[in-house]
């Protein structure tokens, strides 16, 4: 249950607040392009954070980086809810992404630490179910919150959700990295990243996946304005 909640941080923080785009644009007296920056910056934070948390978790264990990440997500969600300006909101979204990707990365690492091949496959399938349901349910719940309480309510709910997740991690999730496993130096991760960047086959697959995802998220970023403002979907 805890790992499922942690793995849902990324999808929730993307799809949950999409229905609030038009209201946010009105609140900050700006256009849709500037509001969409809050989504682009979030993806930038996710990209950077995933490169960082893996090596740190291999060096220092899973629990402490996870608590730090969830704490960052909680604080940034609170800052988003009470952002006095669009620049503040964009900055808070970047920090929110840096914190949120800890749950996405380290929940998988914890499963690998605790389970064998068959057990890992079973748990990963359950985590994928959570990550698949979150983008489906989140926009509906987000739209309901925006209509009832305003766009700030979305980030208040994310603050409460992540605070409960942090408490659950602190009280119910022990360190999973075995003590007898050699701690990997951070320099080793940099060398591995360097080798990947020289691998043409890897770069080809990564570029293909990135282009495909770019098209999907271009639709996601523009769809709230189309459905709400053009078609009048409440």
Q: What does each model-found stretch correspond to?
A:
Residues 92-131:
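Cytoplasmic helix-loop-helix junction between adjacent transmembrane helices
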Residues 20-48:
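Extracellular/periplasmic helix-loop-helix junction of adjacent transmembrane segments
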Residues 29, 61, 82-88, 99, ...:
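Helix-breaking motifs and short loop linkers at transmembrane-helix boundaries and internal kinks
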Residues 176-206:
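Juxtamembrane intracellular "pre-TM" segments in multi-pass secondary transporters
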Residues 15, 43-51, 135-136:
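Residue-level signature of mid-helix packing/kink "hotspots" within the transmembrane helices
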